[in-house]
Amino acid sequence: MGSSCRIECIFFSEFHPTLGPKITYQVPEDFISRELFDTVQVYIITKPELQNKLITVTAMEKKLIGCPVCIEHKKYSRNALLFNLGFVCDAQAKTCALEPIVKKLAGYLTTLELESSFVSTEESKQKLVPIMTILLEELNASGRCTLPIDESNTIHLKVIEQRPDPPVAQEYDVPVFTKDKEDFFNSQWDLTTQQILPYIDGFRHVQKISAEADVELNLVRIAIQNLLYYGVVTLVSILQYSNVYCPTPKVQDLVDDKSLQEACLSYVTKEGHKRASLRDVFQLYCSLSPGTTVRDLIGRHPQQLQHVDERKLIQFGLMKNLIRRLQKYPVRVSRDERSHPARLYTGCHSYDEICCKTGMSYQELDERLENDPNIIICWK
């Protein structure tokens, strides 16, 4: 499990009929000081309105996550059993991924108590110490844990890392599969996604996919955003031979990383051709520069491109951040209304976006802007 949510301590707290709230067990021992527990105990053994709810509290540079449980029955002292099995992490840790684990453990212990008085019986309750020890070690080591409680009960737990929100898929973005396309043609996806999958080829942009698949644009964007979330696709810009690219510092990884070399050469070699050489591919990437279009690259390096598919060369470079696109952004420098559509000429909208929104081709847009003295082009 990532260090961002490493568990420093697991504790079991309960309400004692005479002593009140107390920590019965903790692993490692004495991790939670008396001062810390006194500060947070009202959130560990709580009032009824907070029971059976996930609670995260930060105090004294520690973050405690728990789910206080209350089981009411006349067999218990004061007619209720109150307990909490929780985790302690660093105050700065991102603990969202641990919350479902804490909630699930609270549910398991509640079930075990209702079925066999596991928590309220001293003999069985003592089994919590080795259980907590295994939990701490295995969740920190691998993010998953299997806990045999008794002959008929086993608990399976897994930390599901929270993925960041994917970027918004714009109509001018081009989705590219991150793995073999054929792996994803199955019924695990919703109907909209199944309908657009055949049109994702790494070259069609979102708007074109929408038109050719006959699916409403916003539905296509939502479906692609879902694929982005699960890492099935990534986004690159529209490929045209007038595009300009330049290498990033990561292009050096192509020399140092053997697995990246293998993936790159397999990806960019023309179908049915002899395998491309690393020397040729690296030279092609390094030949990209401001002012050099893809068309220029093809004209200057026919020998190196004998076995290299230039479209896949660009595509792979963008996917792996070996290269980046330099895009043109029109900026209107006066209020002349002839600069229509003026709202798109602010320096914030690329040629890709403007062409998708207006239906103009790159050539048409270029001709229009070249003849407009009130427009300058910013490359970035």
Curated annotation (Swiss-Prot):
Signal peptide as annotated in the record: none
Post-translational modification: In the presence of abundant amino acids, ubiquitinated at Lys-158 and Lys-357 via 'Lys-6'-linked ubiquitination by the WDR24 component of the GATOR2 complex, thereby inhibiting the GATOR1 complex and promoting mTORC1 activation.
The UniProt record lists the keyword Membrane: yes
Residues that hold GDP according to the record: R78
Gene Ontology cellular component annotations, sorted alphabetically: GATOR1 complex; lysosomal membrane; vacuolar membrane
Site (Arginine finger): S124
Asymmetric dimethylarginine: modified positions: R78
One example GO MF annotation: GTPase activator activity
Record's keyword terms, sorted: GTPase activation, Isopeptide bond, Lysosome, Membrane, Methylation, Tumor suppressor, Ubl conjugation
Official protein name in the record: GATOR1 complex protein NPRL2
Biological source species: Bos taurus (Bovine)
